[in-house]
Each structure stands twice: as structure tokens, then as C-alpha cells.
Amino acid sequence: MSYTLKISEQDVLGKGKFKNAKGNTECVAFVQQAAGAPVTTCWQRGLKVSEAGPTEISRGTAIATFDENGKYPTDKLGKHAAIYLTHDETAISVLDQWNSQGEVLPRPIWFGRPEGTPRQNDANTFYVIE
């Protein structure tokens, strides 16, 4: 089962709307609160975004990076969660936030990044959260 936005895309925009228990605007807090995703230890790796056809993933679906064991990463190679908008051969368009950004904004995450690019900035590492 995938997780999708429970509110409108417009309603997620704005400073500091999705905070974790420590008051930080982390990516996971956004996906959990806006799409109803459970704690990350319960996340399962679903369809790889780069292998999906243009209509296989619904707009508003929660996506995240996963490691080689199919788990949300705990290593130092990067991790991220976001809300999928669309994708093509060049990038995934998402809504996301991170602590230093402090708010949900749209952005592209590019395919074809060089070796060593952190997962959060490499579209090839994103999968649907199930």
C-alpha cells in the first residue's frame, strides 16, 4: 500500500508547517504528516521511480531513498523522503523539505548524477514508500 497526500498541494506550502517532535522541519515529518506514512522502520521499498511509466505513480505519492537492503537508509550516503509530483527522463519533480530549508517547496531531483552524489540528490535512488 502506498501513501498519498491527504491535503491539497497548495496547503502544504509555507514555513514550518510540518515539524517533528523536536520542532525540526525534516523530510520524514512532512511525509508522515501530509501522507500518513508510518515510522521509517515500517517503510517498504516499492516501485522504483526511474523504472515507472509516466502514469504508474500517482501525483501526491510518498517516495523515499532506500538502501541496497530495501530499508530507509541509516548510513552516511544520504537519505530523503518527498512527495512525488511527476517525472521524465531528466528528473523527478517533488514537494519536499529539510531542516535548513524550513518549508515545503517544489524542486527537481535529477537523474544521471555523478558517482558519489548523495542519495537525496540522485533520482535513481527513489522508490515509492509502501
Predicted regions located by residue number:
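Aromatic- and glycine-rich peptidoglycan recognition patches
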Residues: 3-18, 85-130
